[in-house]
Amino acid sequence: LFGFLIPLLPHLIGAIPQVIGAIR
C-alpha cells in the first residue's frame, strides 16, 4: 500500500496550494 502511495506524495503535496487557491 505505502509502496503505491509514496510515489504520489510529491504530487499530493504539490496540489495542496492549488486546492487552497480554489477554496479562496
From Swiss-Prot:
<keyword id="KW-0800">Toxin</keyword>
<comment type="similarity">
    <text>Belongs to the grammistin family. Group 1 subfamily.</text>
</comment>
<keyword id="KW-0929">Antimicrobial</keyword>
<keyword id="KW-0044">Antibiotic</keyword>
<keyword id="KW-0964">Secreted</keyword>
<comment type="subunit">
    <text>Exists as aggregates of 3-4 molecules.</text>
</comment>
<keyword id="KW-0204">Cytolysis</keyword>
<keyword id="KW-0354">Hemolysis</keyword>
<protein>
    <recommendedName>
        <fullName>Grammistin Pp 4b</fullName>
    </recommendedName>
</protein>
<dbReference type="GO" id="GO:0031640">
    <property type="term" value="P:killing of cells of another organism"/>
</dbReference>
<dbReference type="GO" id="GO:0042742">
    <property type="term" value="P:defense response to bacterium"/>
</dbReference>
<dbReference type="GO" id="GO:0005576">
    <property type="term" value="C:extracellular region"/>
</dbReference>
<comment type="function">
    <text>Thanks to its abundant amphiphilic alpha-helices, it may integrate into membrane phospholipids, leading to lysis of the membrane. Its hemolytic activity is inhibited by phospholipids, but not by cholesterol. Has antibacterial activity with a broad spectrum against various species of bacteria including both Gram-positive and Gram-negative groups. Also has ichthyotoxic activity.</text>
</comment>
<dbReference type="GO" id="GO:0090729">
    <property type="term" value="F:toxin activity"/>
</dbReference>
